Design a protein with these regions (language model features):
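Signature of Gram-negative outer-membrane beta-barrel scaffolds
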Residues: 151-262, 277, 287-290
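Transmembrane beta-barrel wall of Gram-negative outer-membrane proteins
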Residues: 1-55, 81-83, 145, 210, ...
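Extracellular loop and loop/strand-boundary signature of outer-membrane beta-barrel proteins
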Residues: 15-20, 69-77, 88-90, 119-128, ...
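Outer-membrane beta-barrel signature, preferentially recognizing the C-terminal barrel domain
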Residues: 71-94, 191-197, 242-252, 256-260, ...
Length: 526
């Protein structure tokens, strides 16, 4: 019940455990596209988007506790404003090395903020970010005789981030916030003196359709990235932070083969490599969660991935049945993951592994390169028309990673999940029934760096009175959707979701999924 303008000193008890208070927000989105037809079938497209939200309360932070009491009275995102302007030119040519092409420029501006105030405190902290993103993409292709085709292109991006942070005392008049005190500098979320991330890449891809039974593909991409970040001396958590420059380049490749032994079957195998340079979020972010503070690490290096994929597709001659199986294995070199990090210049606490941050002693961790890791998994999906009007769909995915004895389980490995659905279509009406499900994940399989949000899972009280997190329980969700085409220009959509009103939370989420909901929508084409 506390907000930007409201103040309440005492805790309010939520009488309904299934009701997640302070989770509503509003957002306005504007979309407009202009299409200009040019001579010789060339097309110019202009895409303009603007969105703005209200304040958005962070439910998982508002329910966070310390020493048995709520930690925050306020924790919300301020209104996010996003502007996108993107012109794109699609053209055709009769040149030998250029038959078709598309050039796209994009500019995006994002303003966002994070505001919090601790319980029983009158000090409100604000972190504000202004992000400007520029990008230019050019994609071109041509084809030759004997089944040869070549595509090639370039990409350039530039991201500029300005970060500001301050605290203010709120001035109270009854239950109203009547004014704010002077601003005091506090640590920023991103480098306080500005940061930028740029990249330039070029690629070429060759496809050879040798015959109806065999296709070979080879591609390569050269990528250059550059990161710059600077910190001001004031309100810094680490006196050794000043400037960081990280320039990296990598040549990555892809080789694939597709075999079609019959009209029903297709067999594919792909061998590829990947590269990811640390971005501003990886190197320079400061973020506190449950007494753990992620701090900048200017010594972070790129990570590399080496992948092997294999797949089999089956499609019946009449195309009424389809089945796909995929499996993959990936080795990640110099894997970036969170680990303990000591700020040697800090003397605010006698423990080198902790510092004082916003008046609280917190343990410091940072992103580090921690050797090689291995991921593998599979997915199966397909459909079948049981009759002209009824279609059955199904899918399932499973991923697992190795468990390093020193660094623990890998982060962001979700439990097995899938879906089963049936669709009935007749004339202007379509009825769909969807069943989604997920397996569980043991707390022992959560990453040690906190990326997976173990503290957001259910709590178990042991016989000794100790509190233990249960991990992610398995869950399921059954929903029904109906679409009715009143006319070509008017369409009605009605849905009843989570019919059995199951209370569940998806993996790594800080908020539960919606309960039983009735939805109605109307599509009008003017």
């Amino acid at each position: 019940e506390n907000s930007r303008y409201k103040f309440k000193e005492n805790v309010s008890i939520n009488q309904d455990a299934n009701l997640q208070k302070n989770t509503e927000y509003s957002q306005v989105d504007f979309f407009q596209k202009f299409l200009f037809k040019l001579p010789y079938q060339n097309l110019l497209n202009l895409n303009i988007q603007y969105s703005e939200s209200s304040d958005i309360d962070r439910y998982d932070k508002l329910t966070e506790e310390k020493d048995g009491e709520l930690k925050f009275s306020e924790w919300y995102y301020g209104p996010q404003k996003r502007l996108l302007i993107s012109p794109s030119l699609k053209f055709f040519s009769q040149q030998t090395l250029l038959k078709r092409g598309r050039v796209t420029f994009a500019y995006q501006k994002v303003n966002e903020s994070r505001i919090n105030r601790r319980f029983n405190s009158l000090i409100r902290s604000s972190q504000l970010e202004k992000v400007n993103v520029f990008s230019l993409n050019g994609d071109f292709d041509t084809s030759f005789n004997k089944g040869h085709a070549i595509s090639y292109g370039i990409e350039g991006t530039l991201n500029n981030v300005k970060s500001n942070a301050y605290s203010q005392n709120i001035i109270i008049n009854g239950n109203e916030v009547s004014d704010l005190g002077p601003k005091t500098n506090i640590p920023t979320r991103y480098p306080s003196d500005g940061s930028s991330y740029k990249s330039f890449a070029m690629y070429v891809n060759w496809t050879w359709n040798m015959n109806d039974f065999f296709t070979f593909n080879a591609g390569t991409r050269l990528t250059y990235t550059g990161l710059r970040a600077s910190w001001k001396e004031s309100a810094s958590i680490n006196a050794q932070l000043s400037n960081v420059k990280l320039n990296s380049s990598a040549l990555t490749t892809t080789l694939s083969m597709t075999l079609r032994p019959s009209k029903k079957f297709q067999i594919m195998t792909v061998l590829s490599s990947g590269f990811r340079n640390p971005n501003i979020d990886d190197i320079g972010k400061i973020r506190e969660n449950n007494g753990i503070l992620v701090v900048p690490n200017t010594f972070l290096k790129p990570e590399y991935a080496y992948n092997l994929d294999f797949g089999i597709n089956y499609k019946s001659i009449n195309q009424l049945t389809y089945m796909s199986f995929r499996t993959f294995a990936t080795v990640i070199s110099r894997h970036i993951v969170r680990d303990d990090f000591i700020i040697f210049s800090d003397t605010t606490t006698p423990d080198k592994s902790t510092i004082l941050y916003n008046g609280e002693e917190v343990t410091t961790i940072a992103n580090k390169n921690l050797g090689n890791r291995f991921i593998h998994g599979f997915s199966i999906d397909g459909y079948s028309y049981l009759s002209k009007s009824f279609k059955f769909n199904g899918s399932i995915s499973y991923v697992t990673g190795d468990e390093n004895e020193t660094y623990g389980p890998m982060p962001a490995i979700s439990p097995i999940f899938g879906s089963i659905s049936g669709e009935y279509t007749k004339n202007k009406i379509k009825i769909s029934a969807l069943y989604k499900f997920s397996g569980d994940k043991s707390p022992d399989d959560y990453s040690l760096g906190g990326e997976d949000g173990l503290e957001e899972t259910p709590v178990l009280i042991e016989s000794s009175g100790a509190v233990k997190y249960a991990g992610t329980p398995k869950w399921s969700d059954f929903s029904v959707y109906t679409n009715y085409d009143i006319s070509e220009d008017v369409k009605l959509r009605v849905a009843l979701t989570n019919i059995f009103d199951n209370h569940y939370r998806t993996f790594a989420s800080g908020i539960s999924a919606p309960g039983r909901s009735f939805q109605i929508g109307l599509y009008l084409k003017l």
